[in-house]
């Protein structure tokens, strides 16, 4: 079972986002979809729901509401959490890295 989410370091994770996520995702309001969807407003939204992005059926049918904890569970191993997702990212195995990234995302995607 994945470790529980704990608030991390937003500064450390801005760099993690740039090196691990930015090539496929944007976070700013009105930002474009890239290979992956724009993540603005993701917390509180259900999986597969960003307007204008073409999700796999697996993402649409998962129906999970994104919270800090569900995002942590997903980012540990995306393909295990949502079998059939097209997200190619292998995941973040270290709970601290996930916590830092999610802390950054929670602020950057408001």
Curated annotation (Swiss-Prot):
PROSITE patterns for this protein: CYTC
Entries under InterPro entries matching the protein: Cyt_c-like_dom (IPR009056), Cyt_c-like_dom_sf (IPR036909), Cyt_c_1A/1B (IPR002327)
Location, primary (coarse class): mitochondrion
GO molecular function per UniProt: electron transfer activity; heme binding; metal ion binding
GO cellular component: mitochondrial intermembrane space
Domain of life, source organism: Eukaryota
Membrane-traversing stretches: none
Keywords, in A-Z order: Electron transport, Heme, Iron, Metal-binding, Methylation, Mitochondrion, Respiratory chain, Transport
Name of the protein in question: Cytochrome c
Organism: Schwanniomyces occidentalis (Yeast)
